[in-house]
Amino acid sequence: MLKFTILGCGSSGGVPRPALGWGVCDPNNPKNRRRRTSFLVERHGTGGVTRVLIDTPPDMREQLLDAKVDRLDGVLFTHEHADHTHGVDDLRAFFIKQRQLVDVYVDAQTGETLRARFGYCFQSPPGSEYPPILREHRLVAGQPVTIAGQGGSITALPIVQAHGDIDSIGFRFGNVGNSCDLGGMPRDSAAALAGLDVWIVDALRERPHPSHFSVSDALAWIERLKPRRAILTNLHSELDYEALRQKLPPNVEPAFDGMTFEVEE
């Protein structure tokens, strides 16, 4: 059994946004308060829990405190953009507690960008008394990654996606797919998402966007791939939770922060 938690389902600015507020979202509905997109996968076993985190947004500290995460066995990154990476320094707490480098999994482009922005996390600068906190592993689309932990192993299949002028990485965990921040998908990637029980998929807003699925884009892909259940994520302040929920098909629903579900393998 795998447990999945949507730690954050908001777009790059979250909801509400400083100076810009709630957009069309009803501030009285707690499901409209959205932190930046992140996702947690857990396997519970007799020896404990294995936890894999997807992305380190600026809200990561609060997300992990709310989810009571006290140990991480690995972090998978979807891409280099700030709303998915700029909380990375807060992984330091896990380095301190676990007394070992935190294993992070990145494609070549994301690894290069993280080292340029947060090089001290990978190698101590000259004269610094602070040790590095991260150990880098390379993600290659189509090559599964297995992360071991106290609860057993979690395997993720990286899937390449188009995201404007860069590629991003989606992941498949058994029969659960996570596809945030994408505007298109190669044929081989679509094939890798066949037969899903649950698909968590980008649906930024109603209007088209050059590097994200709109709601109609997401629904068209859901109809094509036919997962049993679909959850829309990366939601902009232009999408009110309840208004969106009411017009979606029965097997499709909006995400909300803290949403959890379990899937048999």
Regions from the language model: what does each represent?
Residues 1-179, 188, 245-264:
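Binuclear metal-dependent hydrolase catalytic cores
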Residues 32, 57, 182, 208-215:
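A conditional alpha-helix N-cap/helix-loop micro-motif detector
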Residues 59, 81, 183, 204, ...:
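Catalytic metal-binding/acid-base residues of hydrolase active sites
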Residues 142, 186-265:
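Binuclear metal-ion centers of metallo-dependent hydrolases, dominated by the metallo-beta-lactamase
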Residues 158-159, 179-181, 201, 232-233:
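Thr-Gly-centered strand-to-loop micro-motif
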